[in-house]
Amino acid sequence: PVEYEVNNTIGTLNVLKCASDAGVRRVVYSASSSAYGDTDKLPSVESDPVNPLSPYGAQKYYGEVMCKMFSEVYGLETVSLRYFNIYGERQNVGGAYAMVIGIFVDQLLKGEPMTIRGDGEQRRDFTYVGDVVNANILASQSEKVGNGEVINIGNGDNRSINEIADMIGDNKVNVDPVIEPPETLADNSKARELLGWEPKGNINTWIPKYKKEMGLDV
């Protein structure tokens, strides 16, 4: 928790302070859907209560609070984009920020089974990295934002971990679950309205391409 606090909370504060001092027009903050935590209300809307289940989720949410404060107090334009489960090229396959698709492919390449936490029925709103990049560009340019708005960046549908594993291979094993939300799903109507954003990534067609590029589908 201490390392996360230094990197996420203090790091964000430093960026906002430097941007304000340097006269930067706008900061687009990479927020996280982990702010929602475990919720029975889906899809998640930006006005929903926050309930982070981890230090990371809590600190990313506090970054949103700081962005809003810098807009109101110091006049720095800010907008916070809550990312939902990003996948795409060059994704991490190990470490704290590794995503499940990359982990599964890496495990199979090593001759290991895909490790599924719990029963695999937990669902995630997988969002293509190219769509996230486009959202950031639009957020930096849109005249409709800049006052500390919080905006979901998610595909707007979700898949179970079992579904993802089945797309990749059939060698899998179930291991002990971890504490995590059973499901995430974004309401992305605010992004469409304020940014003119529309997700275009298709995980069904992307995973086969990724497997081939990684040398798994031979």
Q: What positions do the PLM features span?
A:
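N-terminal Rossmann-like NAD(P)+-binding domain of SDR-like oxidoreductases, especially those catalyzing
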Residues: 1-84, 130-133, 197, 213
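Residue-level signal for the nucleotide or nucleotide-sugar donor/cofactor binding architecture
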Residues: 7-10, 47, 54, 95-99, ...
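Glycine/proline-rich active-site loop of Rossmann-fold NAD(P)-dependent oxidoreductases
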Residues: 61, 86-102, 110-112, 116-117, ...
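Hydrophobic alpha-helix immediately C-terminal to the catalytic Tyr-X-X-X-Lys motif of short-chain
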Residues: 62, 66, 70, 100, ...
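Protein kinase-like catalytic domain
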Residues: 71, 109, 140-141, 214
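C-terminal "lid/loop" region of Rossmann-like NAD(P)-dependent oxidoreductases
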Residues: 119, 149-151, 159-188
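Non-catalytic, hydrophobic alpha-helical segments
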Residues: 132, 136, 153, 164, ...
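Amphipathic terminal alpha-helices
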Residues: 189, 203-218
